[in-house]
UniProtKB/Swiss-Prot annotation, chain A:
Source organism per UniProt: Caenorhabditis elegans
Subunit structure: The 26S proteasome consists of a 20S proteasome core and two 19S regulatory subunits. The 20S proteasome core is composed of 28 subunits that are arranged in four stacked rings, resulting in a barrel-shaped structure. The two end rings are each formed by seven alpha subunits, and the two central rings are each formed by seven beta subunits. The catalytic chamber with the active sites is on the inside of the barrel.
One term under GO cellular component: cytosol
GO terms classed as biological process: proteasome-mediated ubiquitin-dependent protein catabolic process
Family membership: Belongs to the peptidase T1B family.
Protein name: Proteasome subunit beta type-3
Record key words, sorted: Cytoplasm, Nucleus, Proteasome
Pfam family, one: Proteasome
UniProt subcellular location: Cytoplasm; Nucleus
Protein role: Non-catalytic component of the proteasome, a multicatalytic proteinase complex which is characterized by its ability to cleave peptides with Arg, Phe, Tyr, Leu, and Glu adjacent to the leaving group at neutral or slightly basic pH. The proteasome has an ATP-dependent proteolytic activity.
Gene from which this protein is expressed: pbs-3
PROSITE patterns (alphabetical): PROTEASOME_BETA_1 (PS00854), PROTEASOME_BETA_2 (PS51476)
Principal subcellular localization: cytoplasm
UniProtKB/Swiss-Prot annotation, chain B:
Source species, domain of life: Eukaryota
Keyword Metal-binding annotated: no
Organism: Caenorhabditis elegans
Family per similarity comment: Belongs to the peptidase T1B family.
Biological processes, Gene Ontology terms: proteasome-mediated ubiquitin-dependent protein catabolic process
Keywords annotated in UniProt: Cytoplasm, Nucleus, Proteasome
Protein name (Swiss-Prot/TrEMBL): Proteasome subunit beta type-1
């Protein structure tokens, strides 16, 4: 079994019309054993920028601390909020600095920039960024998610539609991915508020 | 006294050549510069995977089966754009298989000949339930050198209801409402879970009925979604529709070709 699927977990993000949705499951495991059922893999960076870290959760924690450190330093030096584009570049650089001994985590960035344009991107473990206009997924349930998202995503979805599409996608994924589950948390980021919903899913 | 030296020289040379050949053979069999893992990797493998995906949905009085028609080598090299993975065994049994194409063809042949013999012995067509059991046993018969295929058997059972049977390579059988197998299985299955199984819908909500038209459009959607992301799936959808009391309909629908 690969280290990338040791703890399990899945993160997905979808872009809409002046809004983005980012969701993750809540399970942490040690291979087949479930250790915790309340671990969000999505973290707040600024009011409108969130980062998701799938993969090996021990590394994910370390990477999160490094991300927060660099983001704080950036905001102190520049005296402005960090844009999602900048943050993803920063994380990409951080990941590539460890090119030959990488952190086993795949980061995902979702947020709105200062013109409220949605931005989503995902990376591999060494920071190769892919920023499509529709949706991204990382983690053990990636394949399951991409299949469903491909059918649910439409152009210019409003926040409530976007939430529904994201929630349905991750729930369908959790149905089949044994390494993720125990509920999901969905963040809907719009220009004036962030809506957090915890959704019940299979408990096995 | 000097006349025989030529012959011994030739004899020595032949002997030397034989020894050289022997040494070459030995070193080819046990190359010392390669790790055991490298040797393992280069060894001949009786199996290969030609990609592609198949899917089947059953309803109250129908069963539909679809597969793509692409055949690939090493997931990137397209061997043909019209390889058929669906076999209509008789008016109410359809077999669809993906995986190792050699075994796909062999499995099809084996079932065809068994059905032919059944027709000869009993003067009637086999029912889908019987065929499902037959296929399971045929797969398990090869327990230790399996057919490297994910098979799905679909059709109309004796009561006129749609049936889908799903198998693993060694014949573990399950009757399901819908099933998928092949490279894009993880992309198709959760979508059908959501749309047909309604697993993400809370209790108390109205569930739309699964009509033939809805099943066909879901099938098209799932293959379009799969072809978008999975590179060994594409080119055409080969769609077979079996409805109780009606002849089997075969359709080809376009899909991504890149």
């Amino acid at each position: 079994m690969s280290i990338m699927s040791y703890t399990g977990g899945t993160v997905v993000a979808m872009a809409g019309d002046e809004c983005v949705c980012i969701a993750s499951d809540l399970r942490i495991g040690e291979q087949m054993t479930t250790i915790a059922t309340d671990q969000k893999k999505v973290h707040k960076v600024t009011d409108k920028v969130y980062v998701g870290l799938a993969g090996f959760q021990s590394d994910a924690r370390t990477v999160l601390e490094k991300i927060m450190f660099r983001k704080n330093l950036y905001e102190l030096r520049e005296n402005r909020n960090i844009k999602p584009q900048v943050l993803s570049e920063m994380i990409s650089n951080l990941a590539y600095q460890h090119r030959f001994g990488s952190y086993f985590t795949e980061p995902l960035v979702a947020g709105l920039d200062d013109t409220n344009k949605p931005y989503i991107c995902c990376m591999d473990t060494i920071g190769c960024v892919s920023a499509p206009r529709d949706f991204v997924a990382v983690g053990t349930g990636q394949e399951y998610l991409l299949g469903v998202c491909e059918n649910f995503w439409r152009e210019n979805m409003k926040p409530d539609e976007l939430f529904e599409a994201t929630a349905q996608s991750i729930l369908s994924c959790l149905e089949r991915d044994a390494a993720s589950g125990w509920g999901a948390v969905v963040y809907t980021i719009t220009k004036d508020k962030v809506n957090v919903s915890t959704i019940k899913a299979r408990m096995d | 006294m000097t006349s025989f030296t030529g012959i011994t020289a030739v004899a020595n040379a032949t002997n030397e050549m034989a020894m050289f050949k022997q040494a070459m053979k030995e070193v080819a069999a046990h190359p010392e510069w390669m790790s055991s893992r490298q040797i393992e990797r280069q060894r001949w493998n009786p199996y290969s995977m030609e990609g592609g995906s198949t899917c089947a949905i059953s309803g109250e009085n129908f069963a539909i089966v679809a597969s793509d028609t692409r055949m690939t080598q090493n997931d990137i090299n397209i061997l043909t754009r019209d390889a058929e993975k669906i076999q209509i065994l008789n008016d109410n049994i359809i077999l669809t298989t993906s995986g190792f194409y050699g075994d796909v063809l062999q499995l099809k042949k084996v079932l065809q000949s068994r059905l032919h013999k059944y027709r000869f012995d009993y003067r009637s067509d086999m029912s889908v339930d019987l065929c499902a059991e037959l296929l399971s046993r045929n797969l398990y018969y090869r327990r230790f050198f399996p057919y490297y295929t994910g098979a799905i058997l679909a059709g109309i059972d004796e009561h006129g209801k749609g049936a889908v049977f799903s198998y693993d390579p060694i014949g573990c059988i399950e009757r399901l409402g819908y099933s998928a197998s092949g490279a894009a299985e993880p992309m198709i299955i959760p979508f059908l879970d959501c749309q047909i199984g309604h697993v993400t819908l809370s209790e108390g909500y109205e569930r739309p009925e699964l009509t033939l038209d809805r099943a066909i459009s879901l099938m098209k959607d799932s293959f379009r979604g799969a072809a978008e992301r999975e590179i060994s799936t594409g080119d055409k959808i080969h769609l077979v529709i079996a409805e109780a009391g009606k002849p089997v309909v075969v359709k080809f629908l376009p899909l991504r070709e890149d």
